[in-house]
Amino acid sequence: MLNSSNYVIQSHCLDDLKYYLESLSYSKVVIITHPQLWVMYEQKITEQLFKLSWNFSVLLIPEGETSKSLKQTTRCWRHFIKHQLDRYSLVVALGGGVICDLAGFVASCYMRGIDTIYLPTTLLAMVDASIGGKTGINTSKSKNIIGSFHLPKKILIDPFTLKTLSKKHYQAGFAEIIKYGMIASPSLFEFLENSWSLIEQRDEGLLEIIIQQSCAIKKKYVEADFKDLGIRAQLNYGHTFGHVIEMMSRYQYLHGEAVSIGMSCAAYLSCQMGLTTQETMQRQDALCQQAQLPIHLPHFPLTRFTYLMAKDKKGRNGSINLILPEKVGKVTQIFDVDPHLIKNTLSTKMTK
C-alpha cells in the first residue's frame, strides 16, 4: 500500500530523480506525457534518467480528457510492443490526471501488469489522480468506465512544478482539496478558508502542508477499502454529478470545475432532504467561490442528465446512489435517491 517509501512530497524532488529512484532497475522505460510538458521537462528528466543509465523512449499524448480513450490506449500498447517492453519494464507518467489515469491503465494491462512511476505536474493529480491506484479510460457514454486498480511503484510530488501551472488548472485542483475537508477534515476546510491569500501566491511551504494533509486523508480511505466497495465511496463526493457535467459539456469543464458544481448540487440536495443545514451548504459554496470555482450548472436536459447519473458505476440496477454532506467533515451515502428530487436540484442550480 501507500507508505513514505513510495510517495514523496518535496519541492524540487524532480531535480534529483537519481536519489529517489537509484534503488530501482528496469530493462526499458517509456515516458508518457503531453507535448507541451515534454518541452518544459525534457532536459531535466533526460539528464536524470541518463544518470540512472535507464534506456527510455517517449510517447507524446494529446492534451485533454478525450485522450483517455481506446484510441490512445492502443497507441500506447503499440509503442510498448515496438520498443519491446517486457515484464521488467517501467512506464513513467509525467503530467496531470489524464496522463496518470491513461498510463496507469495501459501499464496495468500490458503483460498483466508492469511497474509505473508517477511524476504529477498538476495540483489535482498530486492530491487525487496519482494517489490510490485507480486507473481508467472513458467511452462516449461513461467516464472511467474501463479501468483497473494498479498501485504505482513510486510517486514523486514536486510542489515547485505548480509555479508554472495555469491559474485555471491550479484553481481546479482545489476542488478535490475542498472535498477532502468536506468529507473528513473540518480543520483542513477551516485552514483553506483562512489561508487563501497565501494559497493564491502559491507559497511552496503552504502547498506542501496542504498536499500532505490531502494525501494523508486519501491514504486512509485507500488502505481501508482499496477496491472501492465500501467507505472509499465517500471520495466520490460531488463526482456523480460532476462526471455527467463533464460528459454533457464534452469536457469543456475541467474535472475540478465539474466536481465543484457537483459538490454544490449535492449540498443543495442534502439541504432539501434535511440532512444538512443551509450554513454548511453556504460555507462550502463560499469556499468554492473563493477559489474561483463554479457552483452553477449550464442548461442541460434534465432527463438525459439523470439517465446518465443512473449509469454511474457506483449505482446498482439503475438506482442513483449519492454521497451527501451532513456537516463540514462528515458525509453519508444515500441509496436510490428520488430522481425528481435530483431534477429539482439541477433546475435550481442551473445558471439563471
From Swiss-Prot:
Cofactor: binding details: Binds 1 divalent metal cation per subunit. Can use either Co(2+) or Zn(2+).
Database matches in Gene3D superfamilies: 3.40.50.1970, Dehydroquinate synthase-like - alpha domain
EC nos: 4.2.3.4
CDD domains: DHQS
Statement: the UniProt record of this protein carries the keyword Lyase: yes
Catalytic activity: 7-phospho-2-dehydro-3-deoxy-D-arabino-heptonate = 3-dehydroquinate + phosphate
Binding site for NAD(+): 63-68, 97-101, 121-122, 134, 143, 161-164
InterPro entries assigned to the protein according to its UniProt record, in alphabetical order: Dehydroquinate_synthase, DHQ_synth_AroB, DHQ_synth_fam, DHQS/DOIS_N, DHQS_C
GO CC terms in record: cytoplasm
Protein name: 3-dehydroquinate synthase
Organism this protein belongs to: Protochlamydia amoebophila (strain UWE25)
